[in-house]
Amino acid sequence: MAGGLLQLVAYGAQDVYLTGNPMITFFKVVYRRHTNFAVESIEQFFGGNLGFGKKSSAEINRSGDLITQVFLKVTLPEVRYCGDFTNFGHVEFAWVRNIGHAIVEETELEIGGSPIDKHYGDWLQIWQDVSSSKDHEKGLAKMLGDVPELTSISTLSWDVPDNTVLKPSYTLYVPLQFYFNRNNGLALPLIALQYHQVRIYVKFRQADQCYIASDAFKSGCGNLQLDDVSLYVNYVFLDTEERRRFAQVSHEYLIEQLQFTGEESAGSSNSAKYKLNFNHPVKAIYWVTKLGNYQGGKFMTYDPVCWENARENAAKLLLLAQYDLDDWGYFQEPGGYECEGNDGRSYVGDCGVQYTAVDPSNPSEEPSYIFNDTTTAEAFDGSLLIGKLAPCVPLLKRNKDVDLKDKVEGIIRIHTDFENDRMKYPEVEKITRNDLTLHDLSVPISKYDVDNRVDYIKKFDVTVWQHNNFGLLIDGSGNPTHEAELQLNGQPRQSKRGGIWYDTVNPTVHHTKSPRDGVNVFSFALNPEEHQPSCTCNFSRIDTAQLNLWFQHFTNHKFADVFADNDNKVLIFAVNYNVLRMLSGMAGLAYSN
């Protein structure tokens, strides 16, 4: 007997539960016929000029019967530097990461003059983090502008021609996430809204919050303007019979809305309590913390593509910062003003520079100068001088931490003009020790107690905006939430849990993807991404709801004054169900706030 037949006749009482009275077969495809329809994406335009810092609306024309997906099309301008480079120096520029989400401050859906739902750029980023498939990451990165050609730092040197292009023009396609955008079964029936107009509002962020740049760029960039803004709306065209049915009957849709009560201050303490003024059956709560450091703070280096490169670049800048250089990075004559070191002594030169004699007259080999080790530094004799910061004079230091110059060592090559018998400029040939950490790179310049870097090096500082950074460090790592507890009517909804429970365990259980650090989820639903309800908590019937947060402990820690800051903000969102009714050509919500 064949093995397959042996399996077939091995049939017992338990098999009745599996194959008794069968309802399907795996060997005959069964499909269902659908109604006849067609889909076309049609461009819709905003009224008036819509640019950075402005708000406008697009009226959705009745070009089809239903609408589903909507994409916000934004064309970023070509970025050129048009200023007087000789007056300002080092020019650096990059668009922020996920500029497609970051550029949107808020977007709102309105039907018949009544607001139905409002989303925010931060929420669009959070929702993508938890719900997008890894298979779509490459495409979404292109659509949202999270590509190296936009986010990597572009640099201009002093000897470039005017109007040099820093970034090319680029077109973004930002998917909106209103209830009918995410589920074809909830397509918005324009054919049933004969007397109500549908509008979508968009408000953009200010331009200077959408890029990372040095002071030199900001002094000569001019006003950045968006080249083109519109909506691409997917219209569904129905066959005659279904079209008539949609137009004549009333409709009642179970929809999803977003609730957001505004930014809350995290304060400078280790804990905070937030009252949740939410309504309706809520399926999930999401919260993030945005550190003020990364919302307009100035840093000495930035490289979102590779933070190891940023660490190396910071070491090079710290090595060069100890030389007495002019505004173009060349050696300047010794002298200048006096400054006082930690030992109380006065040092002559640019912020306490010690001068060591160097002889450039030997053309056989350009000299190398070993930094940060005065006992083994090579001695040179000659008439020209170079400067090195005196060991007792701090370079870039916080009172609670060591001087950053003590964390790096390297070999510096001195470029020399032998014909004119003079020193030209230093260049880092090799980094021999680099003890800088991401914590060091995450400290904004304003939070250093001492900054004795020469002005030339300060020109490399960049102002950073990271709208998608919900972590502790500049690379987005670390959850600011140490522990959390949700209370309903004064009672804990569940026991206090660690931050990893909310930004790792809960998203892994309830969502498609584990998000970046700091995106915290409390889900009442089994499957919060699905439209089918799978448990909610009716906040309309809760008298008091409160989210208690304990932030990462920095008490008596050397970084306490860096990460515990009054500029830190907590953003709390809730996704709820509501009912949208359509009758006699008009629409309205069944339950208001």
UniProtKB/Swiss-Prot annotation:
<dbReference type="GO" id="GO:0005198">
    <property type="term" value="F:structural molecule activity"/>
</dbReference>
<dbReference type="InterPro" id="IPR016112">
    <property type="entry name" value="VP_dsDNA_II"/>
</dbReference>
<dbReference type="InterPro" id="IPR038519">
    <property type="entry name" value="MCP_C_sf"/>
</dbReference>
<dbReference type="GO" id="GO:0019028">
    <property type="term" value="C:viral capsid"/>
</dbReference>
<keyword id="KW-0167">Capsid protein</keyword>
<dbReference type="Pfam" id="PF16903">
    <property type="entry name" value="Capsid_N"/>
</dbReference>
<keyword id="KW-0946">Virion</keyword>
<protein>
    <recommendedName>
        <fullName>Capsid protein 1</fullName>
    </recommendedName>
</protein>
<dbReference type="Pfam" id="PF04451">
    <property type="entry name" value="Capsid_NCLDV"/>
</dbReference>
<comment type="similarity">
    <text>Belongs to the NCLDV major capsid protein family.</text>
</comment>
<dbReference type="InterPro" id="IPR031654">
    <property type="entry name" value="Capsid_N"/>
</dbReference>
<dbReference type="InterPro" id="IPR007542">
    <property type="entry name" value="MCP_C"/>
</dbReference>
